Amino acid sequence: MSTWSMMNLQDANSPMMEQLIFFHDHTLMILLLITITIIYIISSIIMNNLTNKFIMQNQTIEIIWTIIPMIILIYMAIPSLKILYLNDEINNPLMTIKSIGHQWYWSYEYSDFKNIDFNSFMINSKNLNHFRLLDVDNRMIIPMNNQIRMLINSADVIHSWTVPSLGVKIDSVPGRINQTLMMINRPGIYFGQCSEICGMNHSFMPIVIESTSNNNFISWLKSL
C-alpha cells in the first residue's frame, strides 16, 4: 500500500507486477545512460573551444546516431512486448470472478461454485478501525497461488478496476467485458481504487482484495 511521501513502487505481490518493476528498472537504467551521454556530449562541445566548428557533414557520425537509437529502442521494446502479451494470456484459470463498476461502488460475482454476488461499498471514514477512504464492507476474497480470471464490466459509466501492487489496471466499460489473469503470490490484503474519473464520488470507490489459503477460501464459500 502506498504511504505518505513514498517515492518507490509498491512491493510486487504478483508475477505480473514483478515483470513490470523489472521493465521499469530496465528502462530507467537506459534513460540514465542516455542522460549521462548527452551531458558528456554537451560538456565536451562547450569545453573544446569549437575545435570542429567547420565540419559541415560526417557520414560516419550520421550512421552512428541513426543506428544506436534504433538498437536502444529495440532493447526497450522486447521486454515491453513480452509483458504486453503476457498480460493478455489466459491459460486454464482456477475460477472466474466478475467485477461490475457502478456509481460509486463495485459489485462482484462468483459463478463457478455457486451463484454468489455482493456489493462492495467504502466504509465511512469516521470508523477509525479501518484505513480512511480505502477499506470496504465486503472484500473480494481469492485463493493465493492460483490463476484467477477477472471479467470487468460497468453498469453505467466508464470506470477502471486498478490494484497497483498486483500490476492490474482494467477499464470497466458499459456494454463491453474486458478480462485479465491475476495470481497473487502471498496472503494479504491489497488495496486499489477506481482510476477513471467517473463522477462526483469517483474518489470513494476503493477496491480491496483479500488473498488467503485454499482451505480458508473454501471455508469462506461454505459460510455464504
From Swiss-Prot:
Stored SUPFAM superfamilies: Cupredoxins, Cytochrome c oxidase subunit II-like, transmembrane region
Disulphide bonds in the chain: none
Membrane topology term: Multi-pass membrane protein
Top EC class for this record: translocase
Residues the entry annotates as binding Cu cation A2: C194, E196, C198, H202
Alphabetical list of InterPro entries matching this protein: CcO_II, CcO_II-like_C, CcO_II_C, Copper_CuA, Cupredoxin, Cyt_c_oxidase_su2, Cyt_c_oxidase_su2_TM_dom, Cyt_c_oxidase_su2_TM_sf
Name assigned to this protein: Cytochrome c oxidase subunit 2
Organism: Exeristes roborator
